[in-house]
Amino acid sequence: GYNYRMPNLNASLGIAQMKKIKYFIDTKREVASTYKEFFDNSNIHFYDEPNNAKSNFWLNVLIFENALLRDEALEYTNKNNIITRPPWKLMTKLKMFSDCEKSEITNSEDLESRILNIPSSVPLKN
């Protein structure tokens, strides 16, 4: 059988973090608001929450017009100690799924080449 019990130390840590959840989400929303305002009048699209939802902004994302601009921004930010990264690879591109049935996912493939994940941690200050 499986042992799904959580060790006491992990449970204590989880309870302590849950007591701060409102602060964490409020701070992430403030950071996202700053990003949104900063990129508002540019050719770089900040991926915002949809009108019918409320995001926790766990991960903030920029969408560029093309892969070259994204790659230039990735290089520039990382050279200047701003840690950014491309998104995770699409599952269809992972070796372990190479033999699986695949659909046409041109939109996902296009976005994968133009997305940049930007700093999203709670300790960020506006």
Question: Model regions: which residues?
Answer:
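PLP-dependent aminotransferase class I/II
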Residues: 1-126
